[in-house]
């Protein structure tokens, strides 16, 4: 554990905490956010919170509302906005706007932000710090685990999510966001650079994978900028990156979603194999392919989202797509593949 500039919160390895200390980068992250209201995930010592409070205190946002984002999403293509990264940023900034910072900045301390800004933090030490230095959060400060939290009812309607996600649970956070995609039209977050590149990757390279497909099915991805390890205390061993997810126009996949997930996971689980070979275990488990000496149950089929009818097992359908490896397939390709494998 290490103290952040001698202040009250210790960075805990068990929580994957690396506190962002670069104020310029903190401002850039907040400036990238377009919608409101906002849920901040893992505020820590409030490096983003300090810039969110004046922006959201009066119910106004320098960006658009989630309604505006929803309108934009309706006109955006599902797979647009995969952009490249600007250069790395690293710089120190002004005094954070904690209790002393507000006084020195000359800005009027804003009123409560609870209706427009909520923050969920699992670390008790950070919660105590935030209560002391950011009282305007009020009831909007929630002590708890985001992964176990029911997001419905937090706000009257849709809301944006912002945060510096812990590296060790970033994938779990994204899967929860996918499950709540109708509530969350926008996400601005900082994650491990390698994961950010994977998420924003187009089909083809080996970095393209499960999370790429699942997120791009519902969101347009923008890689905004890279952040060096020197912007944190303690500094991580890897670089970080900031990305923005904006809900695309897709309202449904047009195929069985459970089977779609099973196909994607199975295909990338043996990504060095062609789909013809990698998908065999999935269909065998569901009773769609014969396998000597094995009895296929309806429960096994249900786990895969497939039907285990009593009819004779069918082979994998023919076609050139089955000679490809999974990284060559776009979201639409996986949807088409799922439809071809649907009983």
Regions found by a protein language model. Name each.
Residues 320-333, 337:
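Catalytic core of IPPT-family isopentenyl/dimethylallyl transferases
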